[in-house]
Amino acid sequence: MAVFVANESGVTDFDEVTLAALARFVLDTMKVNPLAELSVMLVEIDAMTDLHVRYMAEEGPTDVLAFPQDEAFEPSWSESPEEDPTTLLGDVVLCPEVARRQAAQAGHGMERELHILCTHGILHLLGYDHAEPEEEREMWKLQNSLLASWDTAAGTGAS
């Protein structure tokens, strides 16, 4: 499972290695093809605002955007991964400045918020959405479960 993290935000008070490990954990837990590749980009607020306007037609910055690459992506993989071609899952774009504000409002640290947002973005790449109330309940439940499992596996608590 290849996870590439590119920090173009200028923000450095979080652990990029841990963020990549979280992403791999989520992908593994969701039984994504082990040959899949994921890009996680962290961008400054102006870049996120531009992406939000350009791709979502919504003004202002947002916290996370997900850009799937392979439309035919299947979240499960065969027992013989060598039979599965490498899959470009997509890009998750995070904005640490927005994450910092949201973290303060939620009463936890920015790194925790980035973990929440990264998990959220990956779920979008896997086809989950929250446009309808039932979809939202399912996605949030799964997101919370994945983060709780990560906390246990990584030996961390929500911070």
From Swiss-Prot:
Entry's Gene Ontology BP terms: rRNA processing
EC number: 3.1.-.-
InterPro entries hit by this protein: MetalPrtase_cat_dom_sf_prd (IPR023091), YbeY (IPR002036), YbeY_CS (IPR020549)
Pfam families in the record: YbeY
Ligand binding (Zn(2+)): 120, 124, 130
Gene3D superfamilies reported in the protein's UniProt record: Metalloproteases ('zincins'), catalytic domain (3.40.390.30)
Cofactor note: Binds 1 zinc ion.
Keyword Nuclease: yes
Cellular compartments annotated: Cytoplasm
Keywords: Cytoplasm, Endonuclease, Hydrolase, Metal-binding, Nuclease, Ribosome biogenesis, rRNA processing, Zinc
Highest taxon of the lineage: Bacteria
Cofactor: Zn(2+)
GO cellular component: cytoplasm
Role according to the record: Single strand-specific metallo-endoribonuclease involved in late-stage 70S ribosome quality control and in maturation of the 3' terminus of the 16S rRNA.
Stated family: Belongs to the endoribonuclease YbeY family.
Listed name of the protein: Endoribonuclease YbeY
Gene name of the encoded protein: ybeY
